[in-house]
Design a protein with these regions (language model features):
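Nucleotide/phosphate-binding catalytic cleft detector across ATP-hydrolyzing
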Residues: 1-159, 176-191, 203, 211-308
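Ser/Thr-glycine-rich phosphate-binding loops at phosphate-binding pockets of nucleotides
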Residues: 162-168
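PRPP/pyrophosphate-binding module of the type I phosphoribosyltransferase fold
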Residues: 169-174
Length: 308
């Protein structure tokens, strides 16, 4: 969270697997109730409805504006950032983003979705919040993570943002993004998760919890049977190999360019790929995109004298 005059800029990365802010990360999931539920962890109360945040993953949808879920998740993200600073009443500017090739088509609609209620009062985790959403801006995913160090991107570079739902690819040549060489594929880490579950069922007739698989993907190991671990590891290696195959289809050549990998899927490259660290950089900061959104909006406000 950044402060510009009397307004707080809050960057939010609306992921398909996790919601990220500059300082927080929580699972993208919303369960709505008409009455107060028994379990109240991460409970958000708004508009006479009760929402359990992060209870289970939201299904992938190319359109994040189909329902109220991402709006409610936005309120939870704002509350988490404000709570860190012990602020419960504030004017807020939202800095958000969309997959590279979807920005031009969906930017305005997503912006209107985020600012549809100027004044919002809600309760999250037992604390009341009163916020005024005074504006929002939407930026391209992936690129936001490198905006603070574009000076490192001399020559030809490929940027790859591996999320839960999508993989976004962009060329950055001589410190400038190439808008004509941007690609979005529905090949996020969720696809790997589905293949792992399928292989575990086919080979071992087992349905392990998603949390166990996630631990292997994040850390490369877990306290499970060796044969199960081998199946998960082998499937993850196949997925990573497929990532590099797709990158080559979009023009990646390790001898001609450097590769910069960001997003939650970066840990899979680190854990399951063999690569030259002098040619491939993996940014493990899962909050880097949200931080980048904040920086981009801050720079815009400074340049425009406070105008969006």
């Amino acid at each position: 969270m950044k402060k510009y005059k009397e307004t707080y800029i809050i960057g939010i990365d609306h992921g398909y697997g996790n919601m990220k802010t500059a300082n927080c990360c929580f699972q993208t999931g919303v369960t709505v109730y008409d009455k107060e539920p028994i379990f109240k962890d991460n409970l958000l109360v708004w508009n006479n409805k009760y929402y359990l945040i992060g209870a289970e993953h939201k299904e992938f949808s190319a359109d994040k504006m189909l329902d109220e879920d991402y709006y409610v998740l936005t309120l939870a993200a704002i509350a988490r950032e404000l709570n860190i600073a012990k602020i419960y009443s504030a004017d807020v500017l939202i800095a958000a983003g969309l997959p590279l090739t979807w920005v031009s088509e969906q930017r305005e609609e997503f912006k209107q979705y985020l600012i549809k209620n100027e004044t919002v009062g809600f309760n999250f985790k037992g604390k009341d919040y009163h916020i005024r959403i005074v504006g929002a801006d939407v930026y391209p995913q992936g690129f936001a993570t490198i905006v603070n160090h574009l000076s490192d991107f001399s020559g030809v570079n490929m940027l790859c943002d591996i999320g839960n739902g999508t993989m976004n690819i962009m060329f950055v040549n001589d410190k400038k993004p190439n808008p004509h060489r941007c690609f979005t594929e529905k090949f996020g880490t969720h696809q790997c998760m589905l293949h792992i579950r399928e292989n575990l069922m086919r080979i071992h007739h087992a349905e392990p919890p998603e949390e166990m698989i996630t631990r292997v993907l994040r850390f490369g190991a877990a306290d499970i049977d060796g044969d199960y671990l081998k199946t998960v590891t082998n499937t993850a290696k196949e997925y990573v190999a497929d990532i590099f195959r797709r990158l080559r289809e979009h023009g990646y050549d390790s001898k001609l360019m450097k590769l910069y990998i960001v997003g939650g899927g970066g840990c899979m490259i680190r854990n399951f790929a063999e690569y030259d660290e002098s040619r491939i950089t993996v940014n493990d900061d899962i909050c880097a995109t949200a931080k980048g959104y904040e920086r981009m909006l801050e720079m815009k406000l400074i340049k425009n004298g406070g105008a969006l």
